């Protein structure tokens, strides 16, 4: 569940809300057949885990009738920085319009996104931005909607978005949008913890991006790898071989688990000790199999700040 951090504001109008929303990975990702009634999307059974790499979305109230605006900042914007990028297709903007329609508000809001989550990386950066926008507007517009209602809006936008509203651990079914929150002390999470899927981790990130439809199309052709908990890993590695090298290097250096995150190409390496973390980082640097290394922890959850 998200955390709200705010000063005492009484009945004053809220003018700006910032949300730090974490990335996600899939500790397991089992892919079933595609369904025409889902627009060709595949049936999924997955364990989501929120990872402590955060995008920050700030939603600021604008004058009535002035419309929306979008500003992106960050050192690793990828294709989002392209002059040809259509801001109306940005996930946060889509979330703004979906919330405006659902709540009968005008979308007179300035959105600023400070991106730290790798773009096109299988870590739901766009979904995190949409979820952050939904959480911010729930506070900015004083809706006070329960998380279940927010998830209904999020589910119309994409599979990962309902999970990104809460973070932590969850099981996703359907095409990923049906969320069952998992207790940190429950049997499923306890089993994953015993297998090394928790705690400190390293993210191996890349300048290259993978498009999710391309990865699924490749999966449809070649299927899943034997024993892969992520059924998309074989397809992602076939399209981006450096991810496979990063997995091998991490496991050889002492990672408890290493795998492609979602549809890739980012690689997650859980490291049980500080020595293992140092060894994996050195292995990745020496082999140049990743472009950027991010050290963090899991699980993580969104944080809402009332800023003005």
Swiss-Prot record:
EC numbers for this chain: 2.7.1.148
Residues the record lists as binding ATP: 118-128
Pfam families: GHMP_kinases_C (PF08544), GHMP_kinases_N (PF00288)
Xref: InterPro entries: GHMP_kinase_C_dom, GHMP_kinase_C_sf, GHMP_kinase_N_dom, IspE, Ribosomal_Su5_D2-typ_SF, Ribsml_uS5_D2-typ_fold_subgr
Catalytic site positions: 24, 160
Cystines in this chain: none
Keyword Kinase among record annotations: yes
Molecular functions (GO terms): 4-(cytidine 5'-diphospho)-2-C-methyl-D-erythritol kinase activity; ATP binding
Keywords: ATP-binding, Isoprene biosynthesis, Kinase, Nucleotide-binding, Transferase
GO process annotations (BP): isopentenyl diphosphate biosynthetic process, methylerythritol 4-phosphate pathway; terpenoid biosynthetic process
Record bears the keyword Transmembrane: no
Pathway in which this enzyme or protein is active: Isoprenoid biosynthesis; isopentenyl diphosphate biosynthesis via DXP pathway; isopentenyl diphosphate from 1-deoxy-D-xylulose 5-phosphate: step 3/6
Catalytic reactions on record: 4-CDP-2-C-methyl-D-erythritol + ATP = 4-CDP-2-C-methyl-D-erythritol 2-phosphate + ADP + H(+)
Function: Catalyzes the phosphorylation of the position 2 hydroxy group of 4-diphosphocytidyl-2C-methyl-D-erythritol.
Family of this protein: Belongs to the GHMP kinase family. IspE subfamily.
Name of this chain's protein: 4-diphosphocytidyl-2-C-methyl-D-erythritol kinase
């Amino acid at each position: 569940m998200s955390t709200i951090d705010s000063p005492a504001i009484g009945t004053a109008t809220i003018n700006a809300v910032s949300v730090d929303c974490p990335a996600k990975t899939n500790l397991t990702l089992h892919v079933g057949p595609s369904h025409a009634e889902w627009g060709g999307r595949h049936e999924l059974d997955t364990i989501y885990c929120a990872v402590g790499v955060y995008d920050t979305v700030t939603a600021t109230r604008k004058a009535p009738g002035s419309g929306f605006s979008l500003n992106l900042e960050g050192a690793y914007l990828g294709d989002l920085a392209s002059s040809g990028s259509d801001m109306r297709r940005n996930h946060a903007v889509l979330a703004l319009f979906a919330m405006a329609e659902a709540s009968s508000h005008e979308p007179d809001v300035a959105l600023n996104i400070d991106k730290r989550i790798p773009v096109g990386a299988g870590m739901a950066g766009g979904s995190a931005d949409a979820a952050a926008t939904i959480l911010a507007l729930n506070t900015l517009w004083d809706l006070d909607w329960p998380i279940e209602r927010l998830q209904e809006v999020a589910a119309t936008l994409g599979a990962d978005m309902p999970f990104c509203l809460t973070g932590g651990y969850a099981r996703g079914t359907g095409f990923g949008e049906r969320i069952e929150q998992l207790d940190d002390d429950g049997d499923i999470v306890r089993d994953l913890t015993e297998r090394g899927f928790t705690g400190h981790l390293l993210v191996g990130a890349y300048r290259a991006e993978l498009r999710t439809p391309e990865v699924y199309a490749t999966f449809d052709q070649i299927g899943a790898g034997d024993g892969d908990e992520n059924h998309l890993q074989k397809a992602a590695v076939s399209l981006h071989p450096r991810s496979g090298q990063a997995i091998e290097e991490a496991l050889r250096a002492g990672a408890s688990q290493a795998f492609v995150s979602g549809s890739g190409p980012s690689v997650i390496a859980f490291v049980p000790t500080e020595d293992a973390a140092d060894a994996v980082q050195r292995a990745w640097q020496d082999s140049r199999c990743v472009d950027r290394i991010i050290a963090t922890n899991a699980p993580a959850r969104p944080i809402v700040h009332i800023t003005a």
